[in-house]
Design a protein with these regions (language model features):
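Flexible, substrate/cofactor-facing loop regions flanked by secondary structure
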Residues: 8-9, 113-191
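Conserved donor-binding loop and adjoining core beta-sheet/short helix segment
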Residues: 9-69, 74, 179-191
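Residue-level recognition of the GNAT/N-acetyltransferase active site
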Residues: 49-53, 78, 199, 203, ...
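Acyl-donor-binding surface of acyltransferase catalytic domains
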Residues: 52-118, 254-258
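Conserved hydrophobic beta-strand within the GNAT/NAT acetyltransferase core sheet
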Residues: 74-77, 193, 227-231
Length: 261
């Protein structure tokens, strides 16, 4: 957790202790007044978070963590949390990317897939072809934007696979192979569209739109009125796709990074 508000008054003098690898405590007379954590994501990137009520405690924790960890290091902040954003910038991190969170209405007009393409509903995709498509998409990302530009949940995992639950994926099939996919997760009552991807050689034919409107239609039939999705502001195609379906921006987060010295 990152602290968003700092209390006023006398700033405490604290001692920063590294408890275990990846965890720091700020101690004021043996009382914990702040915590810092470094988490390594599947692609190897290290993300920082600090929980502290006093600005000076935040600064001391962040400074100790940055001194102990190899760079680059990253953090993610709600863009409306100006104080927290300023705190990380004060520590030397700079904004690297911005993601918009969209609220997506499920009442959309279905988009028909192009001739020869069929939509395989979630839960019906064959495991082998789905994982093969996953490998193709990952290879194309490696050759293009790179995994650092992708959300954490689609990053390559230690086993070399990003498919955790095949039942969450609807796919587009053409000529006996899977050429596109969409994944929906539901951690809360509002479903999250976590990934929409189409093979590079099959893009710009309306496959992504067909997959997405199919998925939204299924949610609508289940009585769900909205879903949400996060889109990198630099991804012009994804932004255009979601906004063409009536999605509206609800909030934004920024990823900050401090590069190696």
């Amino acid at each position: 957790m990152n602290t968003a508000r700092f209390t006023s008054g006398v700033e405490p003098a604290v001692e920063i202790i590294r408890i275990v690898p990846g965890l720091w405590h700020a101690l004021d007379d043996d009382r914990v007044t702040g915590r810092g954590e470094a988490t390594t994501r599947p692609d190897g990137r290290v993300f920082l978070s600090v929980d502290a009520w006093h600005r000076s405690v935040f600064d001391q924790l962040a400074g100790a963590m940055l001194a102990a960890l190899p760079e680059p290091v990253h953090t993610v902040v709600d863009e409306t949390d100006h104080e927290l954003l300023a705190s990380w910038q004060r520590a030397g991190l700079t904004i690297r990317r911005r993601e918009w969170e969209y609220v997506v209405p499920t009442a959309t007009r279905p988009a028909s897939p192009p001739r020869g393409v069929t939509i395989v509903p979630a839960g019906s995709a064959e495991d082998g072809p789905l994982r093969e498509l996953d490998r193709v998409v990952r290879a194309e990302v490696d050759a293009g934007l790179g995994w650092a530009a992708m959300p954490a949940e689609v990053l390559v995992r230690p086993a070399g696979d990003t498919i955790v639950d095949p039942a969450k994926y609807a796919v587009a099939a053409e000529d006996g192979a899977y050429v596109g996919l969409v994944r929906v997760t539901q951690v809360t009552r509002q479903p999250r569209i976590g990934l929409v991807a189409v093979r590079a050689d099959r893009q710009r034919r309306g496959i992504a739109s067909a997959l997405l409107t199919h998925t939204l239609g299924v949610l609508r039939q289940a009585g769900i009125e909205t879903a949400y999705a996060e889109v990198n502001e630099a991804n012009v195609a994804a932004t255009a796709l979601f906004e063409s379906l009536g999605a509206r921006r609800a909030s934004s987060t920024v990823e900050l990074v401090r590069h190696g010295r």
